[in-house]
Amino acid sequence: MGVNAVHWFRKGLRLHDNPALRECIRGADTVRCVYILDPWFAGSSNVGINRWRFLLQCLEDLDANLRKLNSRLFVIRGQPADVFPRLFKEWNIAKLSIEYDSEPFGKERDAAIKKLASEAGVEVIVRISHTLYDLDKIIELNGGQPPLTYKRFQTLISRMEPLEMPVETITPEVMKKCTTPVFDDHDEKYGVPSLEELGFDTDGLPSAVWPGGETEALTRLERHLERKASVANFERPRMNANSLLASPTGLSPYLRFGCLSCRLFYFKLTDLYKKVKKNSSPPLSLYGQLLWREFFYTAATNNPRFDKMEGNPICVQIPWDKNPEALAKWAEGRTGFPWIDAIMTQLRQEGWIHHLARHAVACFLTRGDLWISWEEGMKVFEELLLDADWSVNAGSWMWLSCSSFFQQFFHCYCPVGFGRRTDPNGDYIRRYLPVLRGFPAKYIYDPWNAPESIQKAAKCIIGVNYPKPMVNHAEASRLNIERMKQIYQQLSRYRGLGLLATVPSNPNGNGNGGLMGYSPGESISGCGSTGGAQLGTGDGHTVVQSCTLGDSHSGTSGIQQQGYCQASSILHYAHGDNQQSHLLQAGRTALGTGISAGKRPNPEEETQSVGPKVQRQSTN
């Protein structure tokens, strides 16, 4: 009797660098590649149509590539725990292969399937290929705790064994002794469904800006490397107006779905760098996107509450406001700030926005203007963002909301000045907010300041055709910086650790921060004026922080100050220690250090609260 094998695709939707699939094929007489799709999940999950379309395109491309190997993809409807016992019997399966899933939900799911496989006498093959490293080994090297500073993470991986090279692509030669039983009704039973079959209305759906699949991913990788080689520049690209638009060399969604191997990307970058730089050793910063992704995966792998504030041992318990109306305006691009609204419109239409655009809208929602929980923003990104990844998405939102990892709350992105400096002419605004197309560049970022004659000439009256600003940014940012200052002063006293950020060495604050882990967080100055705040650090010193607060919006009387009526609820924390447990749960790990309460961090970790200073290589 022959050996029948199944490879279960989840992420890792590719044939190149797929060690689990190669191992599955070795010694097998038949192999079936399956993807399990829950139709109920499609209709009830918080995943938008662009992400579903990208996934289905990935599956279609995978099926097309398998056809070239005289094989097919089997898309099976149902739940894994229900599907596999049936498949094990029906197909007489001897071995099952999977790519290791490091996320808590995935580990729990896979443990259940391994148990079912064991009961059925099925061998389970697991290989790591969605991350560069074995995350458990990083944690073991750190004494059993995940590193919570990027510098500590870099130190640990520098002690790891060199990375293994990507395995060879699955070819007809690899498959020659292995067949796939395919019958005439395959498409009917196991074909990739359409969006319509999953219950989506596709009327008026524009064509995909980011086509899914391994074929597209590898084409983009070559373009990406060709561009780098042509300019011989491995530094972080400067942001400009063109950076805001989707790039044909962008890679982040393909890494997210595993259409592109992170190891292949890593070694291709290494080879190109050595070729251009004449064999000099590449700096860690060359791999910035990949290493930040790895950092967040490591932080999340043993923390099932990583995407929650409550019960999350590394998250500061900040008393955010609940304001559904304000949240909806932000999510739907109706804040009255063209820069914010254009970004959210692009996100909803295309499924992608530039990493610094992510910084801007995340800051606006949380600590900058609306004081709404990062959890709410994370859910919107999970729905709309093609490259939204459970670990990276949650970690990045905690980061930029100053809930974990770094605490530079005195930096505030101005919803007017940031965009104006990036795209002075306002072409990005006109592209995504055509209602403002008629405004001259002088007023396109703050159209409420335009004289009535300008608004009439633009055929757009603010408050009628386009909303007035929902908050006064100058007042909101001042209040929220004060709120954060009080929280961290109290937390610092409670833990006895120096948790407050120190003054950046660069007076503009550039070089620290980051959202989505894909690029250095150029901390952008605000709208113009700057104020100072004296912040007490955990060691008893007082430093003057440069707080970029922005211009007040003249001519905007009557703007609702939504989400700020509870300011006093946080200010009282500075006056007594009986409220401290609200900030960081007692008995948990100290924020940003991985050190238990009462112990002093080592000097390396103690200095990391200012956030990592590392040049990050963007792939977007």
From Swiss-Prot:
Keywords: Biological rhythms, Chromophore, Cytoplasm, DNA-binding, FAD, Flavoprotein, Nucleotide-binding, Nucleus, Photoreceptor protein, Receptor, Repressor, Sensory transduction, Transcription, Transcription regulation. Residues 3-132 form the Photolyase/cryptochrome alpha/beta domain. It comes from the Eukaryota. It holds the Pfam family DNA_photolyase. FAD binds at S252, Q289, H355, D387, A388, D389. A motif (LIR 7) lies at residues 335-339. A motif (LIR 6) lies at residues 285-290. A motif (LIR 13) lies at residues 492-497. InterPro entries: Crypto/Photolyase_FAD-like_sf, Crypto/Photolyase_N_sf, Cryptochr/Photolyase_FAD-bd, Cryptochrome/DNA_photolyase_1, DNA_photolyase_N, Rossmann-like_a/b/a_fold. A motif (LIR 9) lies at residues 395-400. A motif (LIR 8) lies at residues 379-384. It is found in: Cytoplasm; Nucleus. GO terms for biological process: circadian regulation of gene expression; circadian rhythm; entrainment of circadian clock by photoperiod; negative regulation of DNA-templated transcription; negative regulation of gluconeogenesis; response to light stimulus. One of its GO terms (molecular function) is FAD binding. A motif (LIR 11) lies at residues 430-435. PROSITE patterns: PHR_CRY_ALPHA_BETA (PS51645). A motif (LIR 2) lies at residues 82-87. Expressed in the retina. Belongs to the DNA photolyase class-1 family. Transcriptional repressor which forms a core component of the circadian clock. The circadian clock, an internal time-keeping system, regulates various physiological processes through the generation of approximately 24 hour circadian rhythms in gene expression, which are translated into rhythms in metabolism and behavior. It is derived from the Latin roots 'circa' (about) and 'diem' (day) and acts as an important regulator of a wide array of physiological functions including metabolism, sleep, body temperature, blood pressure, endocrine, immune, cardiovascular, and renal function. This is Cryptochrome-1. The gene is CRY1.
